[in-house]
């Protein structure tokens, strides 16, 4: 089970580009906004656990 934190780097239409906090040099993860909290903005932090994202 992967548990990690992300920073929302960019919101692009129906998708958000996320950067892992613990691996900042890794490629950005593209996630459908439908899977993310509606309140996200660029620069906010997300916690991911069991494919559920929450704002931290």
Give short role names for the model-derived ranges.
Residues 1-12:
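Structural detector for short beta-strands of small beta-barrel domains
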Residues 35-48:
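Short nucleic-acid-contacting surface segments enriched for D/E, G, S/T with interspersed K/R
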Residues 12-13, 50:
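Residue-level signal for tight coil/turn positions that link beta-strands
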Residues 14-19:
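Short aromatic-glycine-enriched beta-strand elements
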Residues 26-37:
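Beta-strand/loop nucleic-acid-binding surfaces
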